[in-house]
Amino acid sequence: TRYCSSVNKQGELSSWTDKVRVVPRTQRLIPPKIDEDVVAVIYDALLNNRKFLGSYLKRGMRVSKEYPVSPLGLVFRDGVTYLVATLREYPDVRQMALHRFRNAERLDEGIKSPKGFKLDHYINEGEFDYPEGDFINLEFKARNFVIQALRETPLSHNQGIRPFEEGWVIVSCRIKETQQLRWWLLGF
């Protein structure tokens, strides 16, 4: 939305940022503070396909470590901004919370992107749902009031809903086993 405002300051899009919001479905948490200077370096590196040297504090650690980082994309989830990236020369893709970067310095070296990497594919494969296993056959009993929500926004393309007892239905589908699925099921 910032892009739309800057491109069209006087036109129809100038008030776009005042009219669009993303609201989390979960309990709202206060977003973590992110160092503006660090973010500026990371965004610049991402836009220009350049590496940066990042000092990153992993969760549960007391001391940060420095890594050459190849930024591949940004994902915004529940008030937290994640950098999707590779570290050093390794091809494995990582998720790094921006607020955990303590320092960032631009490097004059192009990024190392895994062959065929696409951010949408990475997300659609469930990497942000914290995979725990393979696909499972899920079947659960739910009250009728859940039916409309699951018809409008199904769990998977092969989801089925069939009547059960008075006021209940059986929902079935084949879906990847993830922590996110467990959290969702526990929400009922």
Describe every region a protein language model picked out:
Residues T1-L57:
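Bulky hydrophobic/aromatic content
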Residues A40-L87, R94:
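Loop-centered beta-sheet repeat module
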Residues E66-P68, V93-L98, E139, I170-S172:
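Well-ordered beta-strand positions in beta-sheet-rich domains
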Residues V75, G79-T81, R88-Y90, L107-I111, ...:
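Short, charged/polar surface micro-motifs in flexible loops or helix N-caps
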Residues G79-V80, H99, E109, E166-V169:
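Beta-strand-connecting loop/turn residues
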Residues E89-Y122:
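Flexible linker/loop signature enriched in Pro/Ser/Thr and Pro/Gly
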Residues D120-F188:
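Polybasic (Lys/Arg-rich)
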